[in-house]
Amino acid sequence: GVIALMTRFGMEVSLAYPKGYELIPEIMETAGTFAEESGGSFNVCNSMDEAFQNADIVYPKSWAPYKVMEQRTELLRKQDTQGLKELEKRCLEQNAEHKDWECTEQNMKLTKDSEALYMHCLPADISSISCDQGEVSAGVFEKYRTDTYVEAGYKPFIIAAMILANRFENPVETLEYLMRRNDKRIHI
């Protein structure tokens, strides 16, 4: 995930989430190891305000707790439709307890010079726009909309690069071969 990538490159990463929303333990361990090896840092807290303090970049993103994803996977394997409905209901109830975990203008004022870059992989739950109570206020999203859309525009290329890197033993050689071949992909 993104926290492992950022810690790998020596960034100071503060991960904040409400209690009960833990991530995959291996990801957390990897992020900690990368931070140690790169000279960065990895801090975990349960306060959005604490994580935003003096931050250069914020990347607030909602997720389901790892334990919920484990339960969901098991229910899917069993094809337990009723169990999935009950789990979804419990998740919505749990999420309702944390509606204050929204990236707002007030949070952004806590960042370095009150001007941190807001990032999001999209789509975002935008309060009063795409939902009643979301993960980011309309004001914050609007201020950073262009930057966020540019960021999202890179996703297809990053995904393609990851596929190439994992499917071919020597991706550079493969790309060079394709370029030399100069085969047109669309034939009319």
Q: Which positions does each model-derived feature cover?
A:
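Glycine-rich loops and low-complexity Gly/Arg-rich segments
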Residues: S14, S38-F42, M69, Q82-K85, ...
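Broad structural signal for hydrophobic residues in well-ordered alpha-helices, predominantly aliphatic
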Residues: A31-F34, N107-M108, M162
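Conserved active-site and cofactor/substrate-binding residues in soluble primary-metabolism enzymes
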Residues: G1, L23-E26, N46, Q53, ...
